[in-house]
Amino acid sequence: MFSMTKERAESLIQSITTSLSTATNRSDYQRWRSQDSFSKDWDSRSSIIASLVPPDSAVIEFGAGRMALKDLLPRGCSYTPSDLVDRGGGTLVCDLNRKMLPPIPRHDVAVFGGVLEYVHDVPRLISHLSNSVEIIVASYAVTDFNQENRRGNGWVNDLSSSDILALFEAAGFRMDCEDHWGTQSIYRFRRQLQHRPECRSR
């Protein structure tokens, strides 16, 4: 008799949803509308990301969710949340998968914590941001370490670490720091950086 665990069933449903999303280049509003979709376990990733943000920076966080990053930022930082839906607190509502991306107000730093996996055209997004920010701090579950069940997780793209570095470089950004959160990589990119200073990784 065929049986399926709840976890496996949920993964299968998510895989189907992701496949449909990929076919239409749309965001999964149903999933991300609810705050229940944002795990508190992700706060430790936000803490690492915050450590890569320079003090006194104007920061915009895409996929802000519970906005845990806001209280983790270094001294003097201002914070603008952005997400698919209005989370309050001055949220810039923005769907990163829309055909026409909106103008992004100037900020020093853009943050993507567990977001790029859900973007259908990552190169287009980074290119769009290239004149709006000086630094991008982004996590990504690279295929080097995360090959299994990507669609079951809702991820719509499959990029290796070298893919990530190449697409950011094509948009005029150079990596100057890399850290890790579990099997995910966390990168800091600076626009038109000529030299790569030392960075202490965890």
Predicted features by range, described:
Residues 108-121:
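A short SAM/SAH-binding and catalytic strip from SAM-dependent methyltransferases
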Residues 68-71, 88, 119, 144-148, ...:
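Short catalytic/ligand-binding loop motif for oxyanion handling, primarily in non-cytosolic enzymes
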Residues 1-105, 193, 198-201:
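Conserved N-terminal segment of class I S-adenosyl-L-methionine
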Residues 146-163:
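Acceptor-substrate binding/catalytic loop of class I
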Residues 162-178:
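A SAM-dependent methyltransferase catalytic signature shared across enzymes that methylate proteins
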Residues 133-146:
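Conserved beta-strand signature within the Rossmann-like core of class I S-adenosyl-L-methionine
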